[in-house]
């Protein structure tokens, strides 16, 4: 299994990113009211949060499936690039919000911004370190 993942570092970073994705899956699918109260979104935002969760949950399912595949991440470049692009978009939007370019009245959370940067870094490291495997 370690050989399929190109080393122990990749095998540590990948589950960390999946745990983070799992956390957001739980929040968006099973506990949207936590996000409603954290960001003062209002009760009418619950359906749209669950719609976001309907995109996050399949991503998590595919990510867990990749862990247990016989060939590991072999040929799964689109999954890794997708995760990188989603995280990058989150970071760009959070910077835009923090700089009052996008939605200047919204409530921001520094913790979410840090997590976004961590996810971008993990995704970039995994793409770089697994490039000969995921693009095979």
What do these predicted regions represent?
Residues 2, 16-48:
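Hydrophobic transmembrane helix segments
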Residues 9-16, 48-55, 78-85, 112:
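Physicochemical signature of membrane-embedded alpha-helices that form the seven-helix bundle of GPCRs
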Residues 19, 23-25, 46-68, 85-91:
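Core segments of alpha-helical transmembrane spans in multipass integral membrane proteins
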Residues 47-50, 106-123:
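Small-residue-rich segments of transmembrane alpha-helices in multi-pass membrane proteins
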Residues 56, 79-97, 117-124:
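Hydrophobic alpha-helical membrane segments
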Residues 63-81:
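Juxtamembrane helix-break-helix junctions at the cytosolic face
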Residues 92-112:
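Membrane-helix boundary connector in multi-pass membrane proteins
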Residues 125-136:
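Juxtamembrane boundary at the C-terminal end of a transmembrane helix
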């Amino acid at each position: 299994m370690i050989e399929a993942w190109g080393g122990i570092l990749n095998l540590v970073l990948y589950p960390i990113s999946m745990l983070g994705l799992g956390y957001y899956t739980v929040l968006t699918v099973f506990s949207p009211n936590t996000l409603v109260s954290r960001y003062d979104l209002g009760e009418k935002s619950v359906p749209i949060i669950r719609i976001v969760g309907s995109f996050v949950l399949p991503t998590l399912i595919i990510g867990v499936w990749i862990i247990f595949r016989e060939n590991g991440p072999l040929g799964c470049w689109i999954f890794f690039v997708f995760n990188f692009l989603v995280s990058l978009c989150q970071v760009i939007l959070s910077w835009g919000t923090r700089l009052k370019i996008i939605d200047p009245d919204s409530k921001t959370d520094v913790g979410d911004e840090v997590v976004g940067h961590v996810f971008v870094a993990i995704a970039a490291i995994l793409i770089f370190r697994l490039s000969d495997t995921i693009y095979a």
